[in-house]
Amino acid sequence: MQTQRVPGRKRGRPPLHSTRVQMAVHNLYSASAASVPAVTIPKKRGRKPRYKIKSPVLMTPLALSPPRSTPEPDLSSIPQDAATIPSLVVPEALTVCLYINKQADVGPYLERRKLQQLPERLGPERPATVLQQAVQACIDCAHQPRLVFSLVKQGYRGELVSVSASFDGKQHLRSLPVVNSVGYVLRFLTKLCRSLLCDNLFSHLPFPGSIGASDKAQEREDGRTESAKVATAEECLANAVGMNRYAMDFSHRGSVTHSSSLYKRLTCGDSHLAGGPATTTSGSRTNPVPSGGSSSPGLRLPASSPKRNGTAIEGNRCAPSPSPEVQDTRRPSSRNPSTWTVEDVVRFVKDADPEALGPHVELFRKHEIDGNALLLLRSDMIMKYLGLKLGPALKLCYHIDKLKQAKF
């Protein structure tokens, strides 16, 4: 059975606009504006199922109001001092003041006449400035500025100050380390003065003035050469006692072997202190007696010694004393190492340790190392240029340090 169609209508979706709307649009241009009916807008499609409407966020009055700054407290009643307002405090610059001891022992590197021309005090200035003035004063007062300049420690980084020295026809500059305290300045100068063999040259406190201090220091300077050539009786006695303490323990040893020429000179010096020869022609030993009448306990042998008159001790003690010419060839010409020649250095190294350093003495003669060069030697230089191993190099550095600390 077929359904009857409506004429003039197609199959499919119905039109969006109704007939009334079509008529209104058709008559839009022909009719007047007053007779045009209102145009209706089709509805939008509805929301999907399970769609939730979000509630609008309500802005609170606090959030809508502009931000307010926290009221600052009233500081008018608070005392304005450094505790409450630290930003207003002006830091005070650190200053250092050093005093120069013109009566100190200047050592072999510095010249006393130039030292007397220096001011009594350096500063007050910044630590770096005072350190520069002190080191420059040491270089200016030196006999040979090149040696003192080589002992100055090189600095790096930060604020640098430099010192200068003129030698070999050129002007040489060297930067000093960064310093920021009084203690560092004193430690740096202490190490430098120890290398220059002139202790107690600088201090942060004034030196006590003495009337005869300058005269005594000058007498020590003038008599240094004579005291190096001729030893007094008191020095020989003190050296003999010191050697007996370490090398003449007769209560525990039956015999004593003398391996050092220095020990032979000291034992021969005992007989000269007694005023006569060490032994008689019959071979019996006489105890040395000083002028005071009582015998020295450091030189007297104990009665319980089993070999008091034995051949081992008597053979060494009765050895003929060497002539003055032989003694001069054995010991350096002066006690001041800065005046030593190459041969003096060779004798010093040979006497210091015959077993460890004796085979290497020719190297010092080959490289022409005199007294000044000996004081500048370090372990790395000895191993690199002289070819010594670490053990002999450390032993030699030990003897050089003892030589630097000795008073000439």
From Swiss-Prot:
Gene3D superfamilies: SLED domain, Transcription Factor, Ets-1. Transmembrane segments: none annotated. Residues 288-306 have a biased composition (Low complexity). The gene is Scml4. The modification Phosphoserine is found at S55, S65. It comes from Mus musculus. Its main location: nucleus. GO terms for cellular component: nucleus. Putative Polycomb group (PcG) protein. PcG proteins act by forming multiprotein complexes, which are required to maintain the transcriptionally repressive state of homeotic genes throughout development. It is found in: Nucleus. Belongs to the SCM family. Residues 274-338 are annotated as: Disordered. It holds the Pfam family SLED. This is Sex comb on midleg-like protein 4. The keyword DNA-binding does not apply. Residues 340-406 form the SAM domain. Keywords: Nucleus, Phosphoprotein, Repressor, Transcription, Transcription regulation. Residues 278-287 have a biased composition (Polar residues). InterPro entries: PcG_chromatin_remod_factors, SAM, SAM/pointed_sf, SAM_Scm-like, SCML2_RBR, SLED, SLED_sf.
